[in-house]
């Protein structure tokens, strides 16, 4: 039994609050245990210069964390005048993951900006951001289809992400909170589609190594968790994107 009472293969309680902010085309507050992230999707009728005239759209992301999202206050990166390497890595990860499940030609020459703002952090902020950002993007695209701005749904599959890790005493764990992540011998972030294909794997041994058997166990548990997340995504989206099942 884990410190928070969960089984080794159990997700933290997860909720999606849709239309959390009224201005963006898509907005979701994702809550995973004590981690809370606001994910907004904004549509812009232009693309970066390197894509102009090519008939393709673009999806890009920004990620930030409120100063007291963590136990100790952190200085805003805007006050420092530059973003950290960690922030840049996460932003690129979110954008890459979302583009993997979108036909950019069907999107047309427009950009979807994803803004993920962590308002409370207890581990798994990047995976929660990806899972929530997919929903925000899907809502925004659903509105474009309803308005007749685009004719066909460019989303090719569902998308979600989760963390898994190996604890010295408890073995393989699903959906690590901050305490578990800090002490894990191995931790991994896994991004997958609804059809069970991998988008990205990020795995690291922390002063430890892991075997192929361990890797298979981690991926199997991640696949289980991601399928549960995608089932919840489908439930909250309902029929707003009927072409996507």
From Swiss-Prot:
Where is phosphate bound in this sequence?
86, 124-126
* Record flagged with keyword Transferase: yes
The superkingdom of the source organism is Bacteria
- Give the disruption phenotype, in one or two sentences: Correct processing of the 3' end of 23S rRNA no longer occurs in the absence of mrnC.
This protein's UniProt keywords:
Nucleotidyltransferase, RNA-binding, rRNA processing, Transferase, tRNA processing, tRNA-binding
The answer on whether this UniProt entry bears the keyword Secreted reads no
Entry's EC annotation: 2.7.7.56
Q: Which GO terms describe its molecular function?
A: 3'-5'-RNA exonuclease activity; RNA binding; tRNA binding; tRNA nucleotidyltransferase activity
Catalytic activity reads: tRNA(n+1) + phosphate = tRNA(n) + a ribonucleoside 5'-diphosphate
Q: Which GO terms describe its biological process?
A: rRNA 3'-end processing; rRNA catabolic process; tRNA processing
Its function? Answer: Phosphorolytic 3'-5' exoribonuclease that plays an important role in tRNA 3'-end maturation. Removes nucleotide residues following the 3'-CCA terminus of tRNAs; can also add nucleotides to the ends of RNA molecules by using nucleoside diphosphates as substrates, but this may not be physiologically important. Probably plays a role in initiation of 16S rRNA degradation (leading to ribosome degradation) during starvation. Plays a role in the secondary pathway of 23S rRNA 3' end maturation.
Q: Which family does it belong to?
A: Belongs to the RNase PH family.
Q: How does it assemble?
A: Homohexameric ring arranged as a trimer of dimers. It has been suggested that the active form is the dimer which binds tRNA and that the hexameric form protects the substrate recognition loop (approximately residues 65-82) from proteolysis.
The misc remark on file is: Sulfate ions in the crystal structure may represent the inorganic phosphate substrate.
In Swiss-Prot or TrEMBL terms, this protein is called Ribonuclease PH
């Amino acid at each position: 039994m884990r410190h928070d009472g969960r089984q080794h293969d159990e997700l933290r309680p997860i909720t999606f609050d849709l239309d959390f902010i009224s201005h963006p085309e898509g907005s979701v507050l994702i809550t995973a245990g004590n981690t809370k992230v606001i994910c907004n999707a904004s549509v812009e009728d232009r693309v970066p210069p390197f894509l102009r005239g090519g008939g393709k759209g673009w999806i890009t992301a920004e990620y930030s964390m409120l100063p007291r999202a963590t136990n100790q206050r952190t200085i805003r990166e805007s006050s420092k005048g530059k973003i950290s390497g960690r922030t840049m890595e996460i932003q690129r990860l979110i954008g890459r993951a979302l583009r993997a499940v979108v036909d950019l030609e069907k999107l047309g020459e427009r950009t979807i900006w994803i803004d993920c703002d962590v308002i409370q952090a207890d581990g798994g902020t990047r995976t929660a951001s990806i899972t929530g950002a997919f929903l925000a993007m899907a809502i925004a695209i659903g509105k474009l289809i309803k308005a007749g701005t685009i004719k066909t749904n460019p989303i090719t599959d569902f998308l979600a992400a989760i963390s898994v890790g190996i604890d010295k005493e408890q073995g393989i764990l699903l959906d690590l909170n901050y305490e578990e992540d800090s002490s894990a011998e191995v931790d991994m972030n896994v991004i997958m589609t609804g059809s069970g294909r991998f988008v990205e794997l990020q795995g690291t041994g922390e002063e430890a190594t892991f075997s192929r058997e361990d890797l298979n166990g981690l991926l199997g548990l991640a696949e289980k968790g991601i399928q549960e997340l995608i089932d919840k995504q489908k439930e909250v989206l309902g029929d707003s994107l009927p072409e996507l099942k």
